[in-house]
Each structure stands twice: as C-alpha cells, then as structure tokens.
Swiss-Prot record:
Protein name per its UniProtKB record: 4-hydroxythreonine-4-phosphate dehydrogenase
Taxonomy of the source species: Bacteria, Pseudomonadati, Pseudomonadota, Gammaproteobacteria, Enterobacterales
Cofactor, free-text remark: Binds 1 divalent metal cation per subunit. Can use ions such as Zn(2+), Mg(2+) or Co(2+).
Gene (UniProt): pdxA
Additional remarks: The active site is located at the dimer interface.
Catalysed transformations (reactions): 4-(phosphooxy)-L-threonine + NAD(+) = 3-amino-2-oxopropyl phosphate + CO2 + NADH
Source species of the chain: Wigglesworthia glossinidia brevipalpis
SUPFAM superfamilies the UniProt entry points to: Isocitrate/Isopropylmalate dehydrogenase-like
Length: 332
C-alpha cells in the first residue's frame, strides 16, 4: 500500500475561478491529503456560491497526512490584501498570489509536501503591481534555483514541451541556441525516464522556421543550431528525431511513436494540445527539484454562470501529481 502523500494547492488569482476549482475538487475523496494555501474566507464564500458545504481543517505539519472525507479540505491560511470581487482584478492582491506561491514552494523544497498543484494566475496584474513575474514556470525555477526548467503540456499520451516560454515572437530567434536546445532535450529525456517510466523514449523536435528552414533557404537555425544539438546527444539511450516542420509534426505517423515533442515556442506547440484537450490537459514543469503540475487554462474572469466552470483539468493535474509523488508508473 502506498504511503499517503501531501499535495499543496495554490488557487491562484482570487478574482478568477481558482477558488471555484478547489471547491469542486473537494467533492471527491483523493488518495492524498490536499492542502490548500489560500484565504479561507474566500474559499468558504465560493463554496456557498456553489451551494456546497465545506469543512476546513487547519494544517499541522506535525500530524501525519490524512485523506479527507468528501467536502473536507486542509488549509494553510494566507489572507488577501484587499476585497475580492469575482471577475474584477485588484492590483492590491498581487502580493497575496506571490505569498501563496512562496509558501507552497518553500514547503516543497523542504519536503513538507510531495507536490505542488497551481491554479491560474493573471500575469498582467502581477506585473502591473511592480513585481517581476513572467509566469509560474519562471517563478518556481528562480525560487528553487533551477537553471533549466521545461514547460510541458500533456493530454493522454501527447506531451508537448517548449524550448522557450513566455517571450515575444520577435525575440524567439535570439533565444534559440545550441546549449538551450541541448539542455532542454536532456531534461525531457530524464523526465520521460524518471517520471513517466519510459526507458528508451522517442523525442521529436520541431524546426523554428516554416518548412524547418527548407535547407537553409528560410532560415538557418535548423542547420546551425537545432540539428547539431540533436546530434550531440546520440550517446543517450533514446531516439531524438528532427528538426521536423511544425506544420507536419502533428501528423499521426509521427505522433504514434512520439513520447514527447519539443516545440521551439509557446504558440507553435500549444495550439494542438489546446484544440484536442482543452480543459482536460495538464501543465507540468520538468526539471524542478519537486513535482509541479497545473491546469491548462487561465483565470476565466468573464465566466458568469457557475455551471460553466469545469474542474477536469484541475482534477487531472492533482491525479498526475499524486501518481508521481506515490511513485506509480505512468504508462503511455
């Protein structure tokens, strides 16, 4: 029997649907103790909005982890700085969001928690407050001193990783270099073996330019950077194939063999997974010293009808975090 683990969850932007997702997932009995790092008053209010009775237990690290009953959650209370109105951003609560992430990250680093699951944040409002914030991936990597984080979204057996994350299109070609591609591929390889238990993985790599550069006629990054980086990893017990044009790589003839695909930038890789698995896929950060999964969607500030809120992505993110933390094999 697997030992019960503790999973810490940050709901994210308080004006968004993160708190609603937590309320909805409380209606299941999980295999781990879920610890929610948030403002308890907002959580209780959202539960009332949904007509759900919620019982909160204050977190005590000296007690053994315990699976909670339906409608019960463990909580680490962190208060918001200002009033919260559903759907309306409040710049004063940006530090609250960072405070919850900081507490959760510290707890994972010191092994207090087995994994972190994050709800959606609003990057813009955090930046507007003066905080240097690019995204969850970059924040968690910086906080944990991880030099080579890899953002990956996955839906069933489709896993799409990114060479670059949240940067403007005009800057992407400047960021793509031999060491970057090589290091990202090594992190992906190690994660496929250690997390997903795939001993001899197959990784496909997208080109940067249309038609993967067309033999250097539409850009030379494929010839000068991507191919040499792939060739330098021939010693690894895996297949790394590419660069392949991004308009071809998502054909079934490639996908059927791919354990992961490395896209060069955010909007090259993620439209495919958002198309086939939106609200049912999971974001996972590879390379961190702890497990971190997340929902595949944003804050959904414009949702008025509570019945439109789906917790499927959050449920999948939690299930994946539990599977990994309890060292279950996650098979293709």
């Amino acid at each position: 029997m697997n030992k019960i683990s503790r999973i810490i969850i940050t709901p994210g932007e308080p004006a968004g649907i993160g708190f609603d997702l937590v309320v909805l997932i409380s209606q299941k009995i999980w295999r781990s103790e879920l610890v929610i790092c948030c403002d308890p008053d907002i959580l209780v209010k959202r539960a009332k909005d949904h007509g759900i009775k919620l019982k909160l237990h204050f977190y005590n690290k000296n007690l053994s982890p315990k699976v909670r009953e339906k409608g019960e959650l463990t909580i680490i209370p962190i208060k918001v700085n200002s009033n919260v109105t559903r759907g309306i951003l409040n710049i004063n609560n940006s530090y609250y969001v960072i405070n919850t992430l900081t507490r959760a990250c510290l707890g994972c680093i010191n092994k207090e928690f087995s994994a972190l699951v994050t709800g959606p944040v609003h990057k813009g409002i955090i930046k507007d407050s003066g905080i240097k914030f690019i995204g969850h991936t970059e924040f968690l990597a910086g906080f944990s001193l991880c030099k080579n984080p890899v953002m990956m979204l996955m839906y069933n057996s489709l896993r799409i990783a990114l060479a670059t994350n949240h940067i403007p299109i005009k800057d992407i070609s400047k960021c793509i270099n031999f060491n970057l591609i090589r290091k990202k591929l090594i992190v992906i390889f190690n994660s496929l073996r250690n997390i997903f238990k795939i001993n001899n993985p197959c990784i496909y790599v997208c080109g940067l330019n249309p038609h993967a550069g067309e033999s250097g006629h539409i850009g030379t990054e494929e010839i000068n950077i991507i191919q040499p980086a792939i060739s330098s990893l021939k010693y690894l017990p895996c297949k790394i194939i590419g660069p392949i044009s991004a308009d071809s790589i998502f054909q079934q003839k490639y996908l059927k063999d791919a354990d992961a695909i490395l896209a060069m930038y955010h909007d090259q890789g993620l439209p495919m997974i958002k198309y086939i698995g939106f609200r049912k896929s999971v974001n996972i950060t590879l390379g961190l010293p702890f497990i971190r999964t997340s929902v595949d969607h944003g804050t959904a500030l414009n949702i008025k009808n509570l019945n439109e809120i789906s917790s499927k992505s959050m449920e999948k993110a939690i299930s994946l975090a539990i599977d990994i933390s309890q060292d279950n094999s996650i098979k293709k």
